[in-house]
């Protein structure tokens, strides 16, 4: 008599199901772990940047204050607003599916809400770099980097070099020259490590330990964060396939330095709201939303090197 086949036996048994969902949609961004967030009242944060300092003069006995540039000029400022926007999506789960397909450690509603929350976090991280400030987007680092804060990479771009990194860090001055981070795409980080190996005998083991205990590479004591949300399809002077390296500072709570994420005081972080039953179908709706934004307090707290070809 023939033995039972695997196909037939499978009809009488179930495979073991692992609880949860294994992540397969991943974009590395080590920088997000250290980005500070500031809660604000209202939907916008206003702050003033120095434009022109009030002038002073060197004076001796009998010097009078008269005429232009005689110590009487007033300071001027530029008012800046960083607005909150909303990242949101609805998780809808059919009542029958929730009632009959939520065993084995996989609650259908919880899985869908978790997926929407992950999407919200990924959307923010993308906007942190690529947001253009138009429509409902907030301005990201590419948009926020001032024209005078760009390191020299030539008319058609350049490969990464130690000289570019040095100039990039020199442009960050709002904390008296302290630089809190360098961030680049994985492709550029590999090229940076190749530079170190080419030195011959140089160690590529310079690392910085983060508050959570993880270690990241470092340059001149400044942590380098891999961030794969940084595009590698930019164009400079006809050269395609370029990318950008950023360096800057993180705000320390004083609202005077570098960058900080923004969120609403009364609804900080990602919120999950039970909207209720759909009016015309057997669906329960949960709304996942995040009131968020990004502020660059000092323009001297962000610098970039665009046109990097590797």
Task: List the model feature ranges, each with a label.
Residues 1-242, 249-310:
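Flexible, glycine/threonine- and acidic-rich loop/arm segments that mediate assembly and lattice contacts
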């Amino acid at each position: 008599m023939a033995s039972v086949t695997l196909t037939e036996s499978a009809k009488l048994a179930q495979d073991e199901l692992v609880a949860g969902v294994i992540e397969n949609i991943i974009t590395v961004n080590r920088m997000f772990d250290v980005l500070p967030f500031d809660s604000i009242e209202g939907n916008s944060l206003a702050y003033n940047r120095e434009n022109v300092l009030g002038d002073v003069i060197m004076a001796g006995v009998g010097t009078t204050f008269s005429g232009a540039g005689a110590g009487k000029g007033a300071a001027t400022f530029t008012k800046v607003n960083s607005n909150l926007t909303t990242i949101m999506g609805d998780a809808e789960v059919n009542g029958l599916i929730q009632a009959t397909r939520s065993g084995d450690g996989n609650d259908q509603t919880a899985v869908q809400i978790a997926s929407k929350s992950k999407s919200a976090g990924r959307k923010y991280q993308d906007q942190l770099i690529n947001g253009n400030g138009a429509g409902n987007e907030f301005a990201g680092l590419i948009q926020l980097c001032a024209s005078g804060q760009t390191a020299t990479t030539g008319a058609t771009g350049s490969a990464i070099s130690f000289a570019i990194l040095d100039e990039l860090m020199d442009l960050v001055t709002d904390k008296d020259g302290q630089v809190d981070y360098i961030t680049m795409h994985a492709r550029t980080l590999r090229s940076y490590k190749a530079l170190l190996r080419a030195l011959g005998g140089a160690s590529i083991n310079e690392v910085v330990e983060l508050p959570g205990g993880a270690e990241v590479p470092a340059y001149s004591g400044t942590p380098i964060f891999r961030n794969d949300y940084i595009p590698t399809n930019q164009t400079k002077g006809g050269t395609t396939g370029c990318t950008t390296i950023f360096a800057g500072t993180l705000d320390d709570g004083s609202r005077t330095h570098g960058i900080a994420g923004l969120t609403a005081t009364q609804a900080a972080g990602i919120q999950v709201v039970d909207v209720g039953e759909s009016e015309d179908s057997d669906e329960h709706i949960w709304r996942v939303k995040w009131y968020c934004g990004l502020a660059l307090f000092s323009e001297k707290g962000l610098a970039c090197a665009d046109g990097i070809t590797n």
